[in-house]
Amino acid sequence: LLSALGYNAIRLYTEDTYEVEGEPYFGYLRGRYSGAELKEMDAYAAARGIELIPCIQTLAHLGTIFRYAEYAPIRDIEDILLVGEERTYRLIDNMFRSLAENFTSRLVNIGMDEAFWLGRGKYQTINGAEKSESIMKRHLERVLEIAAKYGFTCEMWGDMFMRAAYGEVYEHTYDHAEEVKKKVPGNVRLICWDYYHTCLLYTSP
């Protein structure tokens, strides 16, 4: 149907719901896609002229992995990975290795949205207080290095950088766009998503 409608790409959103080699508790009992299933979906899409693009999470939205002691050392707070901990980057490397094996696309969305409490848990205990924006940027640079190692080009959700510039809920004027652009590495594309401006407060003249 999507092919008939003219679509040439589709994004498959996952959190811990895909199989990662070397990480048996990642997606354990969560109905995760196996590598074989991902390859089958990828081939099915490709046969119809559609690129299947993985959307993963490399910072937040990973709360269910922290049910297991294996991942306790890399939990910052809530559903957020501990930035700067090498085990965090081994996990992310394993993620990308699995993506490279199971997808033909070399475009990936690395997530990184809604990490509201970034740096306020174990990270702060270890390193002291630091602005989340600087933690975010440092983590992003590491993730981009890993992605490049496997030949991936990255896009990500832009809300964390936008919130840093605009406040708790960023404005629709985008008058800080250049400021945001300067803070983001040139080899990643920000995608703006917005649940907020559908409410009366932001639609009224």
Show the residue positions of the predicted features.
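Feature activates predominantly on carbohydrate-active enzymes
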Residues: 1-155
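Substrate-binding cleft/loops of secretory-pathway carbohydrate-active enzymes
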Residues: 155-156, 160-193
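Short beta->alpha connector loops
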Residues: 194-198
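Conserved small/polar residues in nucleotide/adenosyl-binding loops
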Residues: 202-205
